[in-house]
């Protein structure tokens, strides 16, 4: 399992597929945002005076994230996206 550092968040992105005229078009290339499940969260970020600011998201949350941000990583057979918390636009309730 991946344990992110600082304000980084590990996401499992929901893959969407779209069919046009019998061809499958990957959804990630179509939308400005994508939906993902939070798998793991770093401890947060430190202020200039050393205080820890806890992240706003927690494992299990469903979030809306910008499409073209983050780093794709593999942990075994699983694919994840590691992003900074600032790239998460909203928590989906």
Curated annotation (Swiss-Prot):
One of its GO terms (biological process) is chaperone cofactor-dependent protein refolding. GO terms for cellular component: cytoplasm. Keywords: Chaperone, Cytoplasm. Its main location: cytoplasm. It is found in: Cytoplasm. Pfam families: Cpn10. The keyword Chaperone applies. One of its GO terms (molecular function) is protein-folding chaperone binding. Heptamer of 7 subunits arranged in a ring. Interacts with the chaperonin GroEL. HAMAP family: CH10. Belongs to the GroES chaperonin family. Together with the chaperonin GroEL, plays an essential role in assisting protein folding. The GroEL-GroES system forms a nano-cage that allows encapsulation of the non-native substrate proteins and provides a physical environment optimized to promote and accelerate protein folding. GroES binds to the apical surface of the GroEL ring, thereby capping the opening of the GroEL channel. NCBIfam families: PRK00364.1-4. This is Co-chaperonin GroES.
């Amino acid at each position: 399992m991946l344990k992110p550092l600082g304000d980084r968040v590990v996401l499992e992105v929901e893959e969407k597929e779209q069919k046009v005229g019998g061809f499958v078009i990957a959804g990630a290339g179509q939308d400005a945002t994508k939906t993902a499940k939070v798998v793991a969260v770093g401890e947060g970020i430190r202020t200039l005076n050393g205080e820890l600011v806890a992240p706003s998201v927690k494992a299990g949350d469903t979030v809306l994230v910008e499409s073209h941000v983050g780093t794709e990583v593999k942990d075994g057979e699983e694919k994840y996206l590691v992003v900074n918390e600032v790239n998460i636009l909203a928590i989906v309730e």
